[in-house]
């Protein structure tokens, strides 16, 4: 049996519910993701509470600031024994290199966020970016690789082309859905689509966290991708 590629996003404000879900799905997921909502509400203390349950934690802070500020932020969390941390690739090579250097003495996987899955082609027009979304994502992935990052966060729509050019990079894919609703994310695909294209990790949130039975929801997801 292959290991679970699922990362469960605990994007909720209620730490009690977050801990309940984490306990329920322990052993069925690769990691749980704690994002900005959770971190601003519960901070390092809340992260520690989740880590103590024994499930690897992906701290999704999407850091984006001048290099020194990002490095100081990383030093504040690097001793938490988290599994993965995110920064924005658009912060630039200097910021990414500084972040990678700050984590060089740890086993934390630093992942660069390319373009948020809530962003679509119309947004690029508003931003004044005169290239396709896919071309821009590939440009950002190239910058991340040049800066020494070994992982990026991208939409499922870019997985295939990224995997074709960078066969060794770790691809973390949000925007995974099981029905036609896309919520606040525009660039979505099914789990099997993303895995077939070369994704390493799939980030799934609401289908699990809003289920009355999170364990059953995870089991259904794993069955759908052939992991039992």
Curated annotation (Swiss-Prot):
Main EC class the enzyme belongs to: lyase
Positions of transmembrane segments: none
Pathway: Pyrimidine metabolism; UMP biosynthesis via de novo pathway; UMP from orotate: step 2/2
Keywords: Decarboxylase, Lyase, Pyrimidine biosynthesis
InterPro entries to which the protein is assigned, alphabetical: Aldolase_TIM, OMPdecase, OMPdecase_AS, OMPdecase_bac, OMPdeCOase_dom, RibuloseP-bd_barrel
Pfam families: OMPdecase
GO molecular function: orotidine-5'-phosphate decarboxylase activity
Record-annotated active site: 62 (proton donor)
E.C. number(s) listed in UniProt: 4.1.1.23
Biological process per Gene Ontology, one example term: 'de novo' pyrimidine nucleobase biosynthetic process
GO cellular component: cytosol
NCBIfam families noted in UniProt: PRK00230.1 (NF001273), pyrF (TIGR01740)
Similarity comment: Belongs to the OMP decarboxylase family. Type 1 subfamily.
PANTHER family per record: OROTIDINE 5'-PHOSPHATE DECARBOXYLASE
Role, per record: Catalyzes the decarboxylation of orotidine 5'-monophosphate (OMP) to uridine 5'-monophosphate (UMP).
Name of the protein: Orotidine 5'-phosphate decarboxylase
The organism of origin for this protein: Anaplasma marginale (strain St. Maries)
